[in-house]
């Protein structure tokens, strides 16, 4: 289902290892460097085998995210960039143009990754989420309750752990709260931000939205690794952002 694609619980095989030149992700990016990129990627994504029953196991999949983008383009008859411009970018009054990597200009954009915007506009997007999908003039663009559902983390296998007993992933958003089993840290897990929505990109790109505190933090980074251990940089961000929130109260 679309919900399972959004939560990365489709059960379809996918290797997201950014260090493995034979991974599905590597094959996807190799396609994108060649003529006929869209057809090449679509062949990979639609040719995958099922590993687990749908909904039972969580596993991050750029292939699933790519397929969501393809579905949106087919449903709207618009490229992802054109749809985003019409549905959000212009209504929200973003200050600058965004750039979405395209396979074919105006027809097929990259669904799995490749969208770029300024730090300021990422912050504006975070403010839009903090208002539960309402524009500054009060107009509701996203269905009421969507972000509550987005923060209802999947309980599928591999999402729930001792560090994150509520689950680690929702509707394309991460739960990067201070791990429940973290020791000798300040703020403590009990003092940390609760219910935050985290967009976590490789090499340390972060948008954190906490609607209860109406706090938005955007971070750009150049971490040496695409996907570090959750005991390292993401923990550091969780602690730092919680400390900022504590000082602002």
Describe each region flagged by the PLM.
Residues 1-20:
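Short helix- or helix-capping micro-motifs
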Residues 196-249:
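Structured C-terminal helix/loop/strand segments within mature extracytoplasmic catalytic/sensor domains
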Residues 54-57, 109-114, 194-198, 226-231:
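Active-site rim elements
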Residues 16-113:
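Catalytic-site signature segments of enzymes, centered on catalytic residues
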Residues 8, 64-71, 113-135, 145-146, ...:
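Active-site-proximal alpha-helical segments within enzyme catalytic domains
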Residues 3-6, 42, 46, 69-73, ...:
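Non-transmembrane alpha-helical segments in soluble domains
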Residues 12, 73-82, 89-97, 117-142:
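Bacterial peptidoglycan biogenesis and beta-lactam-recognition machinery
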Residues 95-99, 152-216:
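Active-site Gly/Thr loop motif
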């Amino acid at each position: 289902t679309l919900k399972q694609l959004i939560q990365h619980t489709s059960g379809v095989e996918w290797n997201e290892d950014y260090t493995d030149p034979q991974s599905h992700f590597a094959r996807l990016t190799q396609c994108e460097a060649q003529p006929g990129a869209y057809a090449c990627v679509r062949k990979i994504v639609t040719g995958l085998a099922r590993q687990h029953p749908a909904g039972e196991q969580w596993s991050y999949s750029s292939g699933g995210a790519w397929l969501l983008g393809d579905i949106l383009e087919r449903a709207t008859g618009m490229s992802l960039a054109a749809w985003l411009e019409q549905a959000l970018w212009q209504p929200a009054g973003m200050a600058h143009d965004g750039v979405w990597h395209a396979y074919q200009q105006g027809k097929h954009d990259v669904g799995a990754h490749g969208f770029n915007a300024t730090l300021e506009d990422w912050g504006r997007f975070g403010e839009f989420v903090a208002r539960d999908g309402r524009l500054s003039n009060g107009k509701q663009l996203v269905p009421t309750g969507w972000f509550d559902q987005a923060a209802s983390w999947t309980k599928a296998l591999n999402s729930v752990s001792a560090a994150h007993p509520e689950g680690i992933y929702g509707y394309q958003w991460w739960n990067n709260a201070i791990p429940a089993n973290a020791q000798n840290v300040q703020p403590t897990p009990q003092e940390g931000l609760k219910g935050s929505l985290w967009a976590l990109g490789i090499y340390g790109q972060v948008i954190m939205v906490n609607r209860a505190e109406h706090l938005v933090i955007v971070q750009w980074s150049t971490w040496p690794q695409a996907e570090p251990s959750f005991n390292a940089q993401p923990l550091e961000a969780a602690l730092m952002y919680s400390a900022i929130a504590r000082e602002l109260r």
